[in-house]
Amino acid sequence: MELSSLTAVSPVDGRYGDKVSALRGIFSEYGLLKFRVQVEVRWLQKLAAHAAIKEVPAFAADAIGYLDAIVASFSEEDAARIKTIERTTNHDVKAVEYFLKEKVAEIPELHAVSEFIHFACTSEDINNLSHALMLKTARDEVILPYWRQLIDGIKDLAVQYRDIPLLSRTHGQPATPSTIGKEMANVAYRMERQYRQLNQVEILGKINGAVGNYNAHIAAYPEVDWHQFSEEFVTSLGIQWNPYTTQIEPHDYIAELFDCVARFNTILIDFDRDVWGYIALNHFKQKTIAGEIGSSTMPHKVNPIDFENSEGNLGLSNAVLQHLASKLPVSRWQRDLTDSTVLRNLGVGIGYALIAYQSTLKGVSKLEVNRDHLLDELDHNWEVLAEPIQTVMRRYGIEKPYEKLKELTRGKRVDAEGMKQFIDGLALPEEEKARLKAMTPANYIGRAITMVDELK
């Protein structure tokens, strides 16, 4: 079978392939090879720019332009050529080195220094920087923009429904009212914290040889300050430098990055489930789309499929991300190869998350508050005013306020008239009685509206 969306084993590349297209140029085999080529070329250019490395003279402008073009115009055909070479070498990074030697063979100035391609490097020098560039690109260009869309979409709901009262539920039972907007603001605030934290994760890299001590570098050029050279090179790629490593960059930052993504995903699962529940309670209605079918046998169904799809894919995403976060920082002695196959799945966890983000955004776009139902539900739960009444009774020293309200309301339905009669019988100042009698389940919402307005 030819590989296609119909024959792909993973639904990430199959059924949902169109939803993860933004990740293909980053996390695919092509993407990894593209970043490896970039690192190898920039390393050669860095060597040529150092006066003490006389065997690699400073490149002429044409040679620099030629090397830059190899990086900028790296194509699928180039990637395919590397894979062809790899069939002989059985070593993926060495195949990149040989590919570059082929590319520079026609330029005498570059051909003369071709043995300095991959100079003093271990494969992991190239790989760790390539993975760092992959993750930085994905974070900055894909993940954070999607997070911003989600946060802004939920903030829009908060503002739109800032004053729509909602009967809260704790333990699934009626509780002190809030507003739809305030509940959305709670989620947006949590997400904003994770957004800031993800943006602040230091993406690290190293280029220091087989065990992190520049052994081969110093053997060849003892007069060069390779530690400084390494720092300059890594930071020139837009990556933070890690000066202390074994053969591998220890991947702690990947754990930090993915733990943060998993936390955001968990917050989104919480949101998906809450909205699913609000739809089930008829608090939200869903806009219907012509032609869509909710059930193969029940024609009336309008299911919350977007939030269900999101929840399921977020679970898969977190399973992958959390495994990566716990596995990658552990490597035997100066390195073992267990991280290699795991690192090839960086895009899988992000891919499932991306599918989920788009599903939630679609679901949010179809939500409409069922205002009449919300008000009706509040009107059938006057017992929630037991809280403010007993609290005011405490202020004025009335004996056993909690117990009296418990006797009136626990396990019972109390209407507006019953509450007013109870208030009239209390030894309270008349202005306090009037204030309490003006309260309804729909307006007993505390600072909910103000807190939405204060959300940044």
From Swiss-Prot:
The modification N6-acetyllysine is found at K94, K366. It catalyses: N(6)-(1,2-dicarboxyethyl)-AMP = fumarate + AMP; (2S)-2-[5-amino-1-(5-phospho-beta-D-ribosyl)imidazole-4-carboxamido]succinate = 5-amino-1-(5-phospho-beta-D-ribosyl)imidazole-4-carboxamide + fumarate; (2S)-2-amino-2'-deoxyadenylo-succinate = dZMP + fumarate. One of its GO terms (molecular function) is (S)-2-(5-amino-1-(5-phospho-D-ribosyl)imidazole-4-carboxamido) succinate lyase (fumarate-forming) activity. It is an enzyme of class 4 (lyase). Fumarate binds at H91, T122, S123, Q247, S296, K301, V302, N303. N(6)-(1,2-dicarboxyethyl)-AMP binds at residues 15-16, 90-92, 122-123, 247, 296, 301-303, 309, 335, 340-344. Keywords: Acetylation, Lyase, Purine biosynthesis. GO terms for biological process: 'de novo' AMP biosynthetic process; 'de novo' IMP biosynthetic process; DNA damage response. Changing H171 to A/N: Reduces catalytic activity about 500-fold. AMP binds at R15, Y16, N90, H91, D92, Q247, N309, R335, S340, T341, V342, L343, R344. Induction: Its expression is under the control of the transcriptional repressor PurR. One of its GO terms (cellular component) is cytosol. The active site is at H171 (proton donor/acceptor), S295 (proton donor/acceptor). Its EC number is 4.3.2.2. Pathway: Purine metabolism; AMP biosynthesis via de novo pathway; AMP from IMP: step 2/2; Purine metabolism; IMP biosynthesis via de novo pathway; 5-amino-1-(5-phospho-D-ribosyl)imidazole-4-carboxamide from 5-amino-1-(5-phospho-D-ribosyl)imidazole-4-carboxylate: step 2/2; Purine metabolism. It holds the Pfam family Lyase_1. Catalyzes two reactions in de novo purine nucleotide biosynthesis. Catalyzes the breakdown of 5-aminoimidazole- (N-succinylocarboxamide) ribotide (SAICAR or 2-[5-amino-1-(5-phospho-beta-D-ribosyl)imidazole-4-carboxamido]succinate) to 5-aminoimidazole-4-carboxamide ribotide (AICAR or 5-amino-1-(5-phospho-beta-D-ribosyl)imidazole-4-carboxamide) and fumarate, and of adenylosuccinate (ADS or N(6)-(1,2-dicarboxyethyl)-AMP) to adenosine monophosphate (AMP) and fumarate. (Microbial infection) Catalyzes the conversion of 2-amino-2'-deoxyadenylo-succinate to dZMP and fumarate, when the bacterium is infected by a phage that produces the substrate of this reaction, a step in the synthesis of dZTP (2-amino-2'-deoxyadenosine 5'-triphosphate), which is a nucleotide then used by the phage as a DNA polymerase substrate. Homotetramer. Residues from neighboring subunits contribute catalytic and substrate-binding residues to each active site. Belongs to the lyase 1 family. Adenylosuccinate lyase subfamily. This is Adenylosuccinate lyase. It comes from Escherichia coli (strain K12). The gene is purB.
